[in-house]
Design a protein with these regions (language model features):
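HotDog/MaoC-like acyl-thioester-processing domains
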Residues: 2-78, 131-139, 146-182
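Catalytic strand-loop segment that frames the active site of acyl-thioester-processing enzymes
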Residues: 45-51, 56-121
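Ser/Thr- (and often Asn-) enriched beta-sheet segments in non-cytosolic proteins
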Residues: 90, 141-144
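Short alpha-helix capping/helix-loop boundary micro-motifs
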Residues: 126-128
Length: 182
């Protein structure tokens, strides 16, 4: 993680378009030219009137130069949820968290979830699955689960934060924090 006032550079590029989905990488590089943060993201092209996905046409993609995908761990689209969660809070979405699309900004879900991870400095990977949109003044039930997952390199500790509306099954977002050894 860069230190305060350290110069960094950020680069982002598209690496694939498929039906209504665009894939892109983001890399943060320190002042020595070393990659210190990498991200992989999926974006959906939406018709803002119908709120439905639309096909990415050749004309839409023409303005993007496709570059190779950054060599990083490839995660599945869905975060596997544990069976049991503990309800830790209920919060109301403030106006400041609403983006120009009229729903809670994607970045705000992560900032909110960070509040429920005991030691954020032990996190070495964050995965987010956005499921539905939270709106202004909507109450979000915050649930947390801590689980051990067997991986190739051994056991991993994950903190899973689930944010849901008041209705059963109305999950808005799930954030999975993989922790390093303490």
């Amino acid at each position: 993680i860069p230190k305060m006032f350290e110069e960094i550079s950020v680069k982002t590029w598209a690496y694939e378009f498929a039906t209504s989905i665009g894939y892109r990488n983001v890399i943060v590089t320190d002042e020595n030219g070393e990659d210190i943060v990498c991200a992989d993201s999926m974006w959906t092209l939406m018709d803002m009137e119908t709120k439905h996905p639309v096909r990415i046409e050749e004309e839409d993609a023409k303005g993007y130069e496709i570059e190779p995908r950054y060599p990083m761990e490839k995660c599945g689209r869905k975060i596997r949820l544990p069976k049991e969660f503990e309800v830790v809070d209920t919060v109301v979405v403030p106006k400041a968290d609403i983006d120009y699309n009229g729903h809670m900004s994607n970045a705000k879900y992560i900032l909110l979830a960070n509040e429920y991870v005991e030691d954020i400095t032990c996190v070495n990977r964050i995965r987010v699955e956005y499921k539905s949109q939270a709106r202004y003044k909507e109450a979000l039930v915050i649930e947390r689960a801590i689980q051990e997952i067997e991986a190739e390199a051994g056991m991993e500790t994950h903190v899973i934060i689930k944010m849901s509306g008041k209705e059963a099954g109305d999950v808005k977002a799930v954030v999975d924090y993989r922790l390093t050894e303490a």
